[in-house]
Regions:
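N-terminal, motif-rich segments that launch catalysis or mediate targeting to/interaction with membranes
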Residues: 24-133, 140-214
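Bacterial Sec-dependent N-terminal signal peptides
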Residues: 1-32
Length: 214
């Protein structure tokens, strides 16, 4: 039934949101996030996800949205990874990019996954994107400031090496642990309580909260 499908997908969404705030956001973090989330999936939710992904796991697809960046056929999804706003702006006050942004992307993914008319290939593609974008949502530099392009124009030294603030958040910090994603997953603090229901209106609050950290 559609109701059950939506509930399972929203449950997965909330699990990711509950866990990702403990991580930084390179490929290792995306995989670790998905590994931990998989521990909390009910059997029915896991079966539904396996059906949509046709045997792939949420861990293996968690970097898919980054992996396809090098393929020009997917150029239109480039802007879906981030939102750039003025320092004192809330998302409601912005003029969304015609090319889309992270907020638009997550809602688009949910629309497809909840649609009766979506094909199997569409559901698979947009679930892969959603899994990744939930991770991007909680990386402050992915909801950053116009003037520094989400930290990409803030150049820093990281243990003597040239880097930028975005890269430090994305990968430098987590790579410093020298741990695999499975090791990270085992060492992450886990939420004491998970809420099953997710209201889509809450998404804009998450966007604004993350932006406040930039």
């Amino acid at each position: 039934m559609i109701y059950n499908k939506q509930k399972k997908l929203r449950f997965l969404f909330y699990i990711f949101l509950s866990i990702i705030s403990t991580l930084n956001w390179g490929s290792t973090a995306h995989r670790a996030m998905s590994e931990v989330a998989s521990f909390y999936l009910t059997e029915n939710a896991n079966n539904k996800i396996n059906e949509i992904l046709d045997g792939e796991t949420i861990v293996t697809v968690s970097t898919y949205a980054d992996d396809i960046k090098s393929d020009s056929r997917y150029d239109k999804y480039y802007n879906w990874h981030f939102i750039n706003m003025e320092l004192d702006e809330d998302y409601e006050d912005t003029v969304p990019s015609e090319k889309g942004d992270l907020f638009i992307a997550i809602n688009r993914c949910l629309d497809i996954l909840e649609s009766d008319s979506a094909t199997d290939s569409e559901r698979s593609f947009y679930l892969k994107l959603l899994i990744h974008f939930i991770g991007d949502l909680h990386q402050p530099m992915h909801i950053g400031r116009y003037e520094d392009r989400g930290g990409n124009r803030i150049y820093v030294k990281w243990f003597g090496r040239n880097s930028n603030l975005h890269r430090v958040w994305d990968s430098d910090m987590i790579n410093g642990y020298n741990m695999s994603y499975t090791e990270l997953a085992k060492n992450l603090p886990t939420p004491e309580k998970l809420e099953i229901e997710f209201e889509r209106d809450d998404l804009i609050d998450w966007v604004n909260e993350v932006h406040s950290y930039t």
